[in-house]
């Protein structure tokens, strides 16, 4: 497990949802990463009596999230991804009708937005799904991070059945940058080499 992120901070502070950001033992190995997620479920169940979970995966992280969603239909209440890959994501076909949120930068140079468009189609019909492409944005959604975090917080809250917590003030706060949020995002992306292959950050907004 790793330290908190801006989204995790918002979930904890604004709607009191216990959150874990995983540092996978073997990154890019879907089966092992899926086992890590299951272990995190068990930890949260033991520590906080959590029974329902929403998974959020970034880039490769979409793969183990969809895998676990297929394996745990009772515990996983929804899945959201940011700039997901399509390799090893067949579990998305078993997610329906549980809700799905796909976010992607239209100018992503690491994994093109066509990946999320493909996942949107593979989810099928009959469930609740949303695809949002951010024009001019990159693999880390660096130009629209606060808005993306707000969308994720609202999605997670609704998927957990906690809509009553989404008052206007909470939603407004979810769309703001917390102290050092930008710097934290940059550090995490650089650590994971997610700004390579020509990617760059642009905070001119």
Per-segment meaning from a language model:
Residues 95-96, 101-104, 108:
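Short beta-strand/loop motif that positions the catalytic acidic residue
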Residues 112-122, 146:
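Short alpha-helix in the alpha/beta-hydrolase fold that links the catalytic acid
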Residues 122-140:
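Catalytic histidine neighborhood in serine/cysteine hydrolases
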